[in-house]
Amino acid sequence: AIKLIQDSTNRLIRYLQFYRYLYSLASEDSKTSIVEVNRLATDFLKSKNHNIELIFTRLYSIDINDHIAQIIICLIVVASNNLSKNAIIKVELEIQHDKFIGMKIVVIATNLKFDQNKTDILLGTGANSSDHSSITIENVHEYYTYYLITEYGYKLLVTPLIDSVEYTLML
């Protein structure tokens, strides 16, 4: 019983740290290390009790702006919501001259659940900023992710493939 309580407490602490970072107000001057982003995302995925392997292809030793880190984490959350038990989420960051220029998240899984309505929201084709009545508890994260992406001048491309989907973020 004590082990169960400890495990539950640790899971809740990881969730709290993750969501506190994800939904905090990022200032333009605040920076976070890519290693910390990896840790937060890994802890979050572990707490979902899925067998999801998170791979950052390059763990640079540079810091990135908090808003970029939030977008990366948002897209990892979106990707993880499309998965069944066993999957791989591969994050490929593009850094040139110590500056973030883009990234690709590749989700590989069998029985991948792809929700076109949520994807339309991510891409802005389903998002209507003047009509907040379409925001629900089920799609609020996609609206938030879309807001961050457009607020900071990025573009998102979503490519569904057989047993995988790619999310490409670019300037």
Which residue stretches match the model-derived regions?
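Conserved ATP-binding N-box helix of the HATPase_c
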Residues: 66-96, 141-151
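Glycine-rich ATP-binding loops of the HATPase_c
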Residues: 153-160
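Solvent-exposed beta-strand sheet faces enriched in polar/charged residues
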Residues: 55-57, 92, 159
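Conserved short strand/loop->alpha-helix "switch" segment adjacent to the catalytic nucleotide/phosphoryl-transfer site
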Residues: 51-78, 129-134
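Conserved DHp (HisKA) dimerization/phosphotransfer helix of two-component histidine kinases, i.e.
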Residues: 2-52
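C-terminal transmembrane helix-loop-helix hairpin of multi-pass membrane proteins
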Residues: 132-135, 141-144, 148, 156, ...
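Glycine-rich/acidic phosphate-handling loop/turn and adjacent ATP-lid/helix
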Residues: 99-140
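Short C-terminal beta-strand
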Residues: 165-171
